[in-house]
Amino acid sequence: MSDILVPLIFTDAAAKKVKFLIEGEENPELRLRVYITGGGCSGFQYGFTFDDKLNEGDLTIENLDVALVIDPMSLQYLIGATIDYVEGLDGSRFVVQNPNASSTCGCGASFSI
């Protein structure tokens, strides 16, 4: 990562997993997009998808030669967050550690502010 201040952290573990998944898709233009939608048991939920397009206003954060992309609407809910990838007994997944969330559901997939 560069010395430029970014509003959230894209961990090495997450970047390594993204890089592995992109290599499997054989499309080097893919980026991991994280976004917020309404729903879930706590009001908002996180979403992850691969995207090969950038939209106007998207923020791109690079780590280990891969990119994380966030749209402006979602970014306001993610400032200060950490995007990570964890593996454990309950499976493996991308996770968001969000200091803006006042509460989260039991599985961590949705949150409220």
From Swiss-Prot:
Described purpose of this protein according to its UniProt entry: Required for insertion of 4Fe-4S clusters for at least IspG.
GO CC field: cytosol
Subunit architecture: Homodimer.
Keyword terms: Iron, Iron-sulfur, Metal-binding
The protein, known as: Iron-sulfur cluster insertion protein ErpA
Claim: Cytoplasm is one of the keywords in the record: no
Cofactor note: Binds 1 iron-sulfur cluster per subunit.
GO MF annotations, alphabetized: 2 iron, 2 sulfur cluster binding; 4 iron, 4 sulfur cluster binding; iron ion binding
GO terms for biological process, alphabetical: iron-sulfur cluster assembly
Protein family according to the UniProt entry: Belongs to the HesB/IscA family.
CC cofactor: iron-sulfur cluster
Pfam families linked to this entry: Fe-S_biosyn
Organism: Glaesserella parasuis serovar 5 (strain SH0165)
Residues that hold iron-sulfur cluster according to the record: C41, C105, C107
Record-linked SUPFAM superfamilies: HesB-like domain
Disulfide bridge map: none
